[in-house]
């Protein structure tokens, strides 16, 4: 209820703009030389980001600030036209920004089984990377084991043409069968591991992370 207070200093976007975002450009350029594709987490912060005053005890004391948005990304692609990015855009506010640059979005299946899937056929868009879960999620088996409404997930998978006898295997199969350009599956999901294989528990410090 208090949000996540990370304690990170904010970027001085006014100064970075004067330098043609050189700080970012150099880092993106280097990473682009050693990796085929980059994943940008918290992409929404280029649109708006949550600013918390120094010394705050919780994140509730912050406010939304406009990010550099199109000006920043125009500069990035002018200087690095070959840059390939996957962007974490789990909120609808940044879909227009993502689509303007034809970027691959992230579709995390654990987050995408909601009320809407009761009304329309479940579908992963082509211009995306599908994940069963990320490093912040529980392994797929743990997630499914702890669900209250397992029958709903089973119904969704049956509607997609699967038998529904092994729902976890159906979800894994759909990740590879769907229209997404890339499927990204954690190894613990492929091996069928549960709670014992979780690698991170957000907002905590301990053996998980």
Predicted regions and their residues:
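Alpha-amylase-like alpha-glycosidases and glucanotransferases acting on alpha-linked glucans and related
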Residues: 1-184, 188-190, 194-195
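Low-complexity, glycine/alanine/valine/leucine- and proline-rich hydrophobic stretches
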Residues: 191-209
């Amino acid at each position: 209820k208090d949000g996540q207070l990370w304690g990170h200093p904010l970027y001085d976007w006014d100064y970075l703009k004067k330098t043609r975002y050189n700080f970012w450009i150099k880092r993106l350029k280097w990473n682009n030389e050693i990796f085929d594709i980059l994943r940008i987490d918290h992409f929404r912060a280029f649109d708006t980001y949550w600013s918390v005053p120094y010394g705050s005890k919780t994140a509730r004391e912050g406010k939304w600030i406009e990010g550099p948005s199109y000006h920043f990304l125009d500069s990035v692609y002018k200087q690095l036209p070959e840059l390939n990015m996957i962007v974490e855009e789990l909120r609808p506010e940044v879909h227009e920004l993502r689509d303007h640059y034809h970027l691959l979005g992230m579709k995390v299946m654990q987050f995408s089984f909601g009320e809407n899937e009761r009304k329309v056929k479940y579908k992963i868009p082509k211009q995306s990377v599908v994940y069963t879960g990320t490093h912040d999620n529980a392994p797929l088996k743990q997630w499914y084991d702890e669900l209250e409404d397992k029958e709903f997930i089973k119904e969704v998978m049956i509607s997609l043409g699967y038998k529904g006898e092994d729902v976890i295997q159906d979800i894994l199969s759909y990740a590879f069968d769907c229209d997404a350009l890339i499927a990204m599956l954690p190894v613990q999901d492929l091996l069928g591991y549960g709670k014992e294989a979780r690698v991170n528990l957000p907002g905590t410090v301990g053996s998980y992370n």
